[in-house]
């Protein structure tokens, strides 16, 4: 049995700082997802302005407790309008939340302290208040499309103050 690889000290050597999105392996690409679940919330688009509005209604496959997909490998079959993120489309999708690791790296920015690749802990996304845990009102299977306007919220498009800090706060 081999020892687990050591995390680099500081942030030198982290792949997202040295590789383009196109150069990343499949595993590296997938690890850019912080597991917040914000992209799995239903969104509405204003037909006149093109503005995007988040709701606190989750996709039918969103596990609101873990903030992950209940059937990730088959999500496109079960949810045909599920958008698969690619290096090309993360640069153009205007509805990705400001905290999105894919979006940050595509823009040449660094990941936040709470991103699991930086913290080494998948729970820091919840600790920082970035995830949808405890904030999903219901599933799209429970809330009719006609009622979605009643569920518009602003928080998914905002970054909590705690999450904007340069490093993990000491409690």
Curated annotation (Swiss-Prot):
InterPro entries: Puta_zinc/iron-chelating_dom, UCP006173. Pfam families: CxxCxxCC. It comes from the Bacteria. Transmembrane segments: none annotated. PANTHER family: UPF0260 PROTEIN YCGN (PTHR37421:SF1). Belongs to the UPF0260 family. HAMAP family: UPF0260. This is UPF0260 protein blr3103.
């Amino acid at each position: 049995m081999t020892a687990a690889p050591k995390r680099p000290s500081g942030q030198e050597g982290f792949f997202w700082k040295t590789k383009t999105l196109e150069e990343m392996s499949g595993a590296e690409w997938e690890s850019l997802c912080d597991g917040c679940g914000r992209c799995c919330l239903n969104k509405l688009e204003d037909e006149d302005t093109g503005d995007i509005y988040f709701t606190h209604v989750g996709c039918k496959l969103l596990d609101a407790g873990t903030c992950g997909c209940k059937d990730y490998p088959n999500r496109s079959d079960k949810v045909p309008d599920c958008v698969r993120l690619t290096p090309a489309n993360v640069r153009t999708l205007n509805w990705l939340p400001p905290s999105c690791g894919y979006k940050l790296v595509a823009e040449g920015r660094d990941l936040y302290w709470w991103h699991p690749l930086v913290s080494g802990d998948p729970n820091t996304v919840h600790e920082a208040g970035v995830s949808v845990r405890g904030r999903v009102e219901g599933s799209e299977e429970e809330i009719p499309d006609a009622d979605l306007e009643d569920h518009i919220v602003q928080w998914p498009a905002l970054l909590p103050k705690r999450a904007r800090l340069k490093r993990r706060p000491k409690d």
